[in-house]
Each structure stands twice: as structure tokens, then as C-alpha cells.
Amino acid sequence: MPSFLTRRVTFAAAHRYRIAEWSDERNAAVFGACARPNFHGHSYVCDVTVTGAIDPVTGFIVDLGVLDDVLQREVRSRFDHANINLDVSEFGDGGLMPTGEELARFIYQQVQHALGELTRVTRVAVSEDATLTAVFEPD
């Protein structure tokens, strides 16, 4: 029977929503204040859940040191105190929109790739604040 473990990581980052091919007026109509040219920031909370069998010797489903190293490299180092649109190439103009949904999916892909066969990531939740959380769960 699988067990689950969730590790939380936080980061502060700025972003805005904008589609380069659209006029400023259309971006403002669709994205509202989130399309403002000077960006805006959040104190993000990201919960990454992994699953696996409990090791009969260690009692763990994953080595927390390894998981923490991956989260530091793939999440905190990439996003903390960054402008997501400008500093994370995948989210630049014409790339991914820096929504909570896209951040959750992107973080899932990066963390799962880094962990490889060690464990399976089953859920990534990204909260911009206490009232809004986006969740990605792979099929």
C-alpha cells in the first residue's frame, strides 16, 4: 500500500499576465490588474507530494535530503526573488503564462525529472496567497 509525503517550499516572485501579440487594451480586458506593465508579486507556497512504499529499513518513502536538494534546485533557486516572466526562460514572451496552474505543472515536470525513478510525484499545489491554490496531478 503506497504512502504519501508532502514537502512545502516557499518563494517570493513577481510576474504578470500578458500575451505579446495582443494589444495592451486586450491584455487588460482579459487579465485585469495582472496585466499591468510593472508586474506584481506574491509570496508563493508550493506543496510537492510524493508517493511510494515505505522502506522497511529506513521507514521513509524518499530520502528527505535528496528531495530537499531537488526542491532547492528546481523550485527555490529558480523562482525565489525572480521575475518569472523575465528570469525563467520557459515563462518569457511566447512561452508559458505564469499562472498558478502552469507553475504547478512546470514544477511537477522539473521535480519528477530530477527525482527520476527514486519516487513518483503525485501532486503539486501552488498557492499565490491564502485564497488561491492551483493543483497539478499527473494522469
Residue ranges and their predicted role:
Residues 1-139:
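Charge-rich, low-complexity N-terminal segments
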